[in-house]
A protein has these predicted regions:
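Extracytoplasmic/secreted envelope proteins and their assembly/folding machinery
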Residues: 37, 41, 60-67, 118-122
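Conserved redox-active cysteine motifs that mediate thiol-disulfide chemistry
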Residues: 25-42
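Short alpha-helical
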Residues: 31, 58-62, 84, 113-116
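Hydrophobic beta-strand anchors of alpha/beta hydrolase catalytic cores
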Residues: 22-23, 51, 97
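Short pre-active-site segment immediately N-terminal to redox-active cysteine/selenocysteine motifs
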Residues: 19-21, 25-29, 93
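Conserved segment of the thioredoxin-like fold in thiol-based oxidoreductases
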Residues: 45-46, 50-82, 94
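Thiol/disulfide oxidoreductase modules built on the thioredoxin-like
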Residues: 68-73, 80-125
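A short beta-strand-turn-helix
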Residues: 1-21
Length: 126
């Protein structure tokens, strides 16, 4: 939906103080990313949660097709063609997801989100 070129996801300045943010590192070629995507779509309508995507080592065209085929839960998407931004966040692969509140990481999910992590996120943001 929105591929942001002007801001950097490397700093916390894009995250506001009020909402919770879910920063999801994903790729169109990642099979576990496809498996977790339905859980991101379920979280998309949570009032005080914004989902931000970091597209990892992917082609923009492939990422757009993935989102067209599977739906777009992201309010913002950043491109990380080289993978260096993900490394700066402490991610070692895809998918990885960070729950952020008041500009601090409060939970890190390594691997695909599932029903259990969906329930955990919903409890935290209520």
């Amino acid at each position: 939906k929105i591929f942001n070129k002007n801001e950097t996801i490397g700093s916390m300045k894009i995250f506001g103080e009020k909402n919770f943010y879910l920063m999801n590192i994903w790729s169109s070629w990642c099979i576990p990313c496809r498996e977790e995507h339905k859980f991101l779509v379920k979280l998309k309508d949570e009032k005080n949660l914004k989902i931000i995507g970091l597209n990892y080592k992917d082609k923009k065209e492939n990422a757009k097709k993935f989102l067209k085929d599977f739906s777009n839960p992201y309010s913002l998407i950043f491109l990380d063609k080289s993978g260096t931004i993900a490394i700066e966040w402490g991610a070692y692969g895809v998918p990885e997801t960070f729950l952020i509140h008041k500009k601090k990481i409060i939970k890190k999910f390594v691997g695909p989100l599932n029903q259990e992590s969906l329930i955990e996120i919903q409890k935290i943001i209520k």
